[in-house]
């Protein structure tokens, strides 16, 4: 049962000793903006030396997988492979490739509310995008991702496509907002998806955390035993809920969005799926449970 206990000492050594692997969120866990969380690169290196598998799960849909891998390298996270990185953009591309499979002349196109990184991920999966050069096939899906150019006219166009009951509505994630370095907030994909849902009267299929579909994408590529895997994240409503839904041990790090007070409030309210099993001040604290 999740009790939001501080992970340290003997409990930390026991939890890490039993774990085969760790899933990490990225923003607010490994870095904040362009600043890495102190000790994060060293932790990943020590986990690798200890034989622990590490994978990374992000709701950020702004970067295609190769670009995300470059970001890891640029920030000083050495030795990681692109195959270890799972974003909501990648998972959306996989889902749409599955759902829109068929003859080339019948596969249809995806209308994208999102940036170039998301579009690149879709193209890499062999999907056709509405508005790309050439004759536009019928739009068979609307995909909502993080879109800094979101507008009333684009919303109207998306709703026009969604009047077709066979047109899919997919969202990369439901994160309502994201923190900025100055303490302010910027709207997240969840805010944009809510606008499309309200205007179209349709319900989006969400692929990112806390949807188990992201874990399904991971298990297609890696052998992962959720009972022996840690999910480490900074957001209770996405990372921790995702971990619970997929049967993992959950660890909240306090370097990002959610606070210990929020976790304790969920515990008091009996909303245990939003309560982590453990918390740490920073993921660097996990190094105390690893042998040198």
UniProtKB/Swiss-Prot annotation:
Cofactor note: Divalent metal ions. Mg(2+) is the most effective.
Keywords: Cell membrane, Cell projection, Cytoplasm, Cytoskeleton, Hydrolase, Magnesium, Membrane, Metal-binding, Pyridoxal phosphate
Location of the active site: 25 (nucleophile), 27 (proton donor)
CDD domains in alphabetical order: HAD_Pase_UmpH-like
Catalytic activity: pyridoxal 5'-phosphate + H2O = pyridoxal + phosphate; pyridoxine 5'-phosphate + H2O = pyridoxine + phosphate; pyridoxamine + phosphate = pyridoxamine 5'-phosphate + H2O; O-phospho-L-seryl-[protein] + H2O = L-seryl-[protein] + phosphate
Binding positions (Mg(2+)): 25, 27, 234
GO MF term set: heat shock protein binding; magnesium ion binding; phosphoprotein phosphatase activity; protein homodimerization activity; protein serine/threonine phosphatase activity; pyridoxal phosphatase activity
EC number: 3.1.3.16, 3.1.3.74
Membrane topology (UniProt): Peripheral membrane protein
Binding site for substrate: 58-60, 178, 209
Entry protein name: Chronophin
């Amino acid at each position: 049962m999740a009790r939001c206990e501080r992970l340290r000492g003997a409990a930390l050594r026991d939890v890490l000793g039993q774990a085969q692997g760790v899933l990490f969120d990225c923003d607010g866990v490994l870095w904040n903006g362009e600043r890495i969380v102190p000790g994060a690169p060293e932790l990943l290196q020590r986990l690798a030396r200890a034989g622990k598998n590490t994978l990374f799960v992000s709701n950020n849909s702004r970067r295609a997988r190769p670009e995300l891998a470059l970001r890891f390298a640029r920030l000083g996270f050495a030795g990681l492979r692109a195959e270890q990185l799972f974003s909501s953009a990648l998972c959306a591309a996989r889902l749409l490739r599955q759902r829109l499979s068929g003859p080339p002349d019948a596969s249809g196109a995806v209308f994208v509310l999102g940036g170039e990184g998301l579009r690149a991920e879709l193209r890499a999966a062999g999907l056709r995008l509405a508005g790309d050069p050439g004759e536009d096939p019928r739009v068979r899906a609307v995909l909502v991702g993080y879109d800094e150019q979101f507008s009333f006219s684009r919303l109207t166009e998306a709703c026009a496509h969604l009047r077709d009951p066979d047109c899919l509505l997919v969202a990369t994630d439901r994160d309502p907002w994201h923190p900025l370095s100055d303490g302010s907030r910027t709207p997240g994909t969840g805010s944009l998806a809510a606008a499309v849902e309200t205007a179209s009267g349709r319900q989006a299929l969400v692929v990112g955390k806390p949807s188990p579909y992201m874990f399904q994408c991971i298990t297609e590529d890696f052998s992962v035993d959720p009972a022996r895997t840690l999910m480490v994240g900074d957001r209770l409503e996405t990372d921790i809920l995702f971990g619970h839904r997929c049967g993992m041990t959950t660890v909240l790090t306090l370097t990002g969005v959610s606070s210990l007070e929020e976790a304790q409030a969920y515990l008091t309210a009996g909303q245990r799926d939003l309560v982590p099993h453990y918390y740490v001040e920073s993921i660097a604290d996990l190094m105390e449970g690893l042998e040198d």
